[in-house]
């Protein structure tokens, strides 16, 4: 059985650039998996994916021409049903064998060869046979069809085939199919195309057309030499990155300054999907456009033209940019000039928007927010702005008195005003960023301007937090208003659905409270955020489920940071109000877990909790010394009298490790108490006193964390 390398290529019209990378990876993976499942390729087969604007291809090593035959065990029926007392086949067995294609003449010999095996209930007859292995043509036909059906296609096209009658659905019209097993064409067909050994190279620069492959292994090299195509997405991407660095260095030499292209992985992926043979060129625009905020210029060059703007060593935008061209003419001046002409109107538009926007102050735009609908149940952006401002003022007053309250309120009022500017209307990604520029232009303090930009932060996992306290307050207010508002009208995330990004908002609140160690109790924050909604029709207070939601997100975030589920549960189950304390509590729990006494105390705490849960009425942590009769309960009480003040003092100062470690002295008296003392004494007074002693022990053990959660 011969094994050779396999090459499959589907030649198509230009594929969607933002989807190309995933399409290429999915096509090769699905194709190879199907071949492996069919027994045509070993599990160790090497797979190489190729993807360019006009082709999807896969190279798979060690593919067999025919899959090995597979032993098949067909369970027939119990021996008692299939054979009579003399060992002859019953009519039921003969009928079953006939269904398997075994005629009456051959049945006798087959019956004699049937295998008997006990299936745990009875002896059963099995018919063992060999299933003929699929040929490569059969297996590859199914593999290609399955791979195409499984592609993550953003939107399909329906197009007519050359016969003028048939039509097929695919992401783009397909015009060629290559299927080579070594040097042999595999006779498969898909999308109205029969496989061959020919494809087409670069639309303009191929030196040979069509490109003909003698065997599967010369695919990439032959496409590169004859077709002027770098077929590998990864190799083409690396080549573009290399050329970008080289062109930036060349541009820097011409100006006497070190220049670098912007670092944008998504843009690099996109341009890789737009070209088959990259050629990076240097363009420039007029210096006057640099008066526009560089975020605007960079965005318009990236989003509209797919250019890489060049920055100087300080990160400041220069008037030079890099173009990733798909052609390499001897004289590139026409290509460069064309790109410079195309980008100029884009930059002129940005300058026009910037100049026009600055003719009106941010404050004068605020009134316009009352005409913008935020949510049909929560009113306009103007009403939302008023709620955010009220929440920001209250938080600011809690953290920094009247001065911070005024600054936070002012920033909150202006935070959404840039939504009504021309620049943000054209580029929504610049909301907040443009607000900062316009606030500075209006003469507002830097901390107010920074807060206008930063109140959206953190926008995503790993994003930076607001740079100042005013921005932090407004960002908290903005996210809390969203959370409280959406929960109050029943818009709670379910499963994968989270259209208002409430999980992200919750994590933002958690990060700002924890990483800034803000002295803001969570319950009080939620009550503060709910207050401005009192006049909203149909709003229902939802602080309790929202708190559950936030603590749940907190627990998930902590587990992702590497804390164990037990450590997280021990701390979060106590629902600490100051989230800034949580890292210290977790560190304390981890240190406590390393003590030799920890396991016994955790188990004892769990036992105490279970005892107290069974009591109908709440137990007060009150002990009458006169009712302490047993030596063990007296010893436990004395230990608590000594340990509790130490643990409390450490807890109050925030030394949670010391507070928990003080509990180690309780192990011996706790063990003795449970060995020697009957908690549920017949005397009600004794029983109540012992329960009070346990309640006191339970309270002491659970100040920092519920250490019972550490019990296995």
Curated annotation (Swiss-Prot):
A GO BP annotation: arginyl-tRNA aminoacylation
Disulphide-bonded residues: none
Enzyme Commission number: 6.1.1.14
SUPFAM superfamilies in the cross-refs: HD-domain/PDEase-like
GO cellular component: cytosol
Enzyme class: ligase
Coiled coil ranges: none
Database matches in InterPro entries: DALR_anticod-bd, Gly-tRNA-synth_bsu, Gly-tRNA-synth_heterodimer
Similarity comment text for this entry: Belongs to the class-II aminoacyl-tRNA synthetase family.
PANTHER family: GLYCINE--TRNA LIGASE, CHLOROPLASTIC_MITOCHONDRIAL 2 (PTHR30075:SF2), GLYCYL-TRNA SYNTHETASE (PTHR30075)
Protein's name according to its UniProt entry: Glycine--tRNA ligase beta subunit
Organism: Dechloromonas aromatica (strain RCB)
Lineage summary: Bacteria, Pseudomonadati, Pseudomonadota, Betaproteobacteria, Rhodocyclales
């Amino acid at each position: 059985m011969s094994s050779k390398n396999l090459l499959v290529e589907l030649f198509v019209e230009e594929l969607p650039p933002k989807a190309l990378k995933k399409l290429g990876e999915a096509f090769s993976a699905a194709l190879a998996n199907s071949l492996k499942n069919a027994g045509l390729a070993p599990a160790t087969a090497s797979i190489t994916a190729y993807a360019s604007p006009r082709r999807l291809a896969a190279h798979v090593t060690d593919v067999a021409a025919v899959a090995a035959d597979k032993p098949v065990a067909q369970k027939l029926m119990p021996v008692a049903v299939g054979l009579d007392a003399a060992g002859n086949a019953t009519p039921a067995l003969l009928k079953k064998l006939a269904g398997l294609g075994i005629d009456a003449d051959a049945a006798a010999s087959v019956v004699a060869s049937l295998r008997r095996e006990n299936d745990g209930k009875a002896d059963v007859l099995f018919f063992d046979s060999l299933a003929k292995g699929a040929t490569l043509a059969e297996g590859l036909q199914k593999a290609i069809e399955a791979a195409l059906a499984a592609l993550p296609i953003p939107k399909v096209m329906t197009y007519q085939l050359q016969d003028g009658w048939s039509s097929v659905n695919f992401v783009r019209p397909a015009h060629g199919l290559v299927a080579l097993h070594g040097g042999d064409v595999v006779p498969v067909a898909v999308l109205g195309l029969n496989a061959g050994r020919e494809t087409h190279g670069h639309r303009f620069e191929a030196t040979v057309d069509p490109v003909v492959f003698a065997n599967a292994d010369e695919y990439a090299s032959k496409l590169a030499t004859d077709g002027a195509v770098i077929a590998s997405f990864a190799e083409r991407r690396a080549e573009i990155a290399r050329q970008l660095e080289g062109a930036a260095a060349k541009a820097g030499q011409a100006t006497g300054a070190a220049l670098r292209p912007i670092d944008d992985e998504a843009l690099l992926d996109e341009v890789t999907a737009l070209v088959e043979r990259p050629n990076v060129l240097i363009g420039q625009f007029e210096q006057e456009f640099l008066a526009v905020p560089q975020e605007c210029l960079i965005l318009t060059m990236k989003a509209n033209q797919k250019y890489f703007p060049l920055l100087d060593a300080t990160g400041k935008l220069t008037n030079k940019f890099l173009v990733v061209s798909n052609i390499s003419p001897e004289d590139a001046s026409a290509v460069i000039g064309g790109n410079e002409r195309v980008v100029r109107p884009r930059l002129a538009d940005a300058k026009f928007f910037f100049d026009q926007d600055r003719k009106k102050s941010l404050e004068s735009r605020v009134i316009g927010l009352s005409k913008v609908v935020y949510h049909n149940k929560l009113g306009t952006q103007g009403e939302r702005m008023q709620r955010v401002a009220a929440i920001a003022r209250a938080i600011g007053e809690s953290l920094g008195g009247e001065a911070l309250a005024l600054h936070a309120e002012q920033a909150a009022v202006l935070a959404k005003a840039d939504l009504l500017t021309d620049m943000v209307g054209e580029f929504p990604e610049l909301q907040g960023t443009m607000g900062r520029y316009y606030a500075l232009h209006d003469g507002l303090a830097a901390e107010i301007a920074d807060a206008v930009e930063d109140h959206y932060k953190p926008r995503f996992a790993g994003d930076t937090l607001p740079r100042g306290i005013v921005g932090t307050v407004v960002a908290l207010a903005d996210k809390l208003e969203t959370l409280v508002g959406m929960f109050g009208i029943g818009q709670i995330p379910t499963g994968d659905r989270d259209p208002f990004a409430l999980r992200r908002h919750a994590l933002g609140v958690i990060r700002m409270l924890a990483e800034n160690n803000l002295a803001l109790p969570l319950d009080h924050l939620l009550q503060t955020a709910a207050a401005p909604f009192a006049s909203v029709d149909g709003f229902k207070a939802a602080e309790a489920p929202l708190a559950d939601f936030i603590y749940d997100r907190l627990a998930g975030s902590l587990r992702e940071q590497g804390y164990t589920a037990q450590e997280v549960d021990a701390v979060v189950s106590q629902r600490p109000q100051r989230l800034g304390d949580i890292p210290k509590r977790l560190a304390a729990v981890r240190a406590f877990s390393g003590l030799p006494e920890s396991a016994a105390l955790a188990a004892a705490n769990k036992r105490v909790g279970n005892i107290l849960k069974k009591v109908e009425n709440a137990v007060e942590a009150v002990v009458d010394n006169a009712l302490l009769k047993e030596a063990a309960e007296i010893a436990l009480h004395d230990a608590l009298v000594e340990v509790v003040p130490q643990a409390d003092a450490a807890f109050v100062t925030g030394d949670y490790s010391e507070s928990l470690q003080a509990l180690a002295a309780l192990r011996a008296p706790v063990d003795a108490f449970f060995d020697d003392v009957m908690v549920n004494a017949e005397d009600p007074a004794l029983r109540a006193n012992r329960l009070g002693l346990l309640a006191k022990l339970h309270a002491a053990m659970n100040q920092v964390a519920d250490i019972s959660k550490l019990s296995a």
